[in-house]
């Protein structure tokens, strides 16, 4: 998700989220200097999304596992991001980083939102942030096993979710809890909210929108996908993920795929023994080479039947919640 989709969602009353993962791939110097290209693009995409949002809420998703994590957080806050969502690891230092960055102009203080996959990981974050920073999350995203991309869940699955209501008595701060993963329709969103959650995060449904920044061929791959085409894969970064079966995955299953210069994306990736470069694979996919790229998706990608608009989807969700 880049500024086009994030801005459109925010303009319609949702929280539009930009992914910072190798966000600078469209910059002319990306392959020569990915670090600077990514930081530049973070700022460009946030500014553009906020212009499109017309006062709506725009946030960024920054993986803890990303190299230069702190720099991306700082750049996002300096540019006026309203929300920082952070997972793929425990964002234990996020409040400290944010505290050191002045909010631009008369902007709103940035909201800090960890992604958790279990009650245990949520409690770790709560206790650590409170003890070290006297700060509690402004919201929590629970990422379930039906989500797209890298998955944080293991055996605990969704067992604890219905009882996850967080409140810190000392501060009387009630913390909204948002469900992510496997939510595709307004009716499904309503079911989670009726169970006491504050909201839902939807991603897969928005890939096949006119406003999504991905290549049309990427969107068509979702529309063409059948349930049996969606498989679990092991990412080079050491986490499981879900993707659409294609030529690339068949080749990856038979052995390492040669790659070029390291783009320095993930802390845990060792270029010397990685089976393939996840950055190169994801960029090929988002640029339209859907047979030779990695098509990350959620479990509901096979439910995509046609192109839609952001407004149509959010109207459906709003109607279901009435």
Positions of the model-derived regions?
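Active-site entrance/lid segments in N-terminal catalytic domains of soluble metabolic enzymes
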Residues: 1-168
């Amino acid at each position: 998700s880049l500024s086009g989709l994030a801005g459109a969602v925010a303009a319609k009353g949702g929280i539009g989220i930009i992914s910072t993962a190798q966000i600078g791939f469209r910059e002319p110097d990306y392959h020569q200097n990915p670090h600077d290209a990514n930081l530049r693009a973070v700022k460009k995409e946030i500014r553009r999304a906020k212009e499109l949002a017309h006062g709506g809420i725009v946030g960024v998703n920054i993986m803890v596992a990303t190299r230069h994590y702190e720099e991306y957080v700082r750049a996002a806050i300096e540019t006026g991001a309203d929300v920082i969502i952070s997972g793929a690891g425990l964002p234990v230092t996020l409040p400290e980083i944010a505290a050191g960055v002045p909010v631009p102009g008369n902007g709103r203080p940035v909201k800090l939102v960890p992604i958790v996959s279990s009650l245990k990981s949520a409690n770790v974050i709560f206790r650590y942030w409170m003890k070290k920073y006297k700060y509690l999350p402004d919201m929590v995203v629970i990422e379930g096993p039906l989500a797209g991309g890298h998955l944080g869940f293991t055996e605990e699955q969704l067992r604890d979710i219905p009882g996850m209501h967080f409140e810190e008595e000392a501060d009387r701060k009630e913390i909204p809890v948002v469900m992510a993963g496997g939510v595709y329709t307004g009716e499904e969103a309503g079911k989670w909210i009726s169970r006491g959650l504050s909201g839902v995060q939807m991603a897969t449904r928005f890939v096949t929108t006119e406003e999504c920044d991905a290549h049309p061929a990427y969107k068509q791959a979702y529309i063409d996908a059948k349930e049996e085409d969606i498989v679990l894969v092991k990412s080079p970064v050491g986490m499981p993920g879900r993707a659409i079966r294609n030529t690339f995955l068949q080749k990856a299953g038979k052995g390492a795929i040669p790659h070029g210069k390291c783009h320095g994306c993930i802390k845990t990736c060792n270029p010397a023994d990685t089976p393939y470069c996840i950055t190169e694979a994801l960029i090929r996919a988002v640029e339209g080479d859907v047979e030779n790229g990695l098509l990350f998706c959620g479990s509901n990608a096979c439910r995509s039947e046609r192109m839609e608009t952001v407004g149509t989807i959010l109207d459906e969700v709003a109607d279901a919640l009435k």
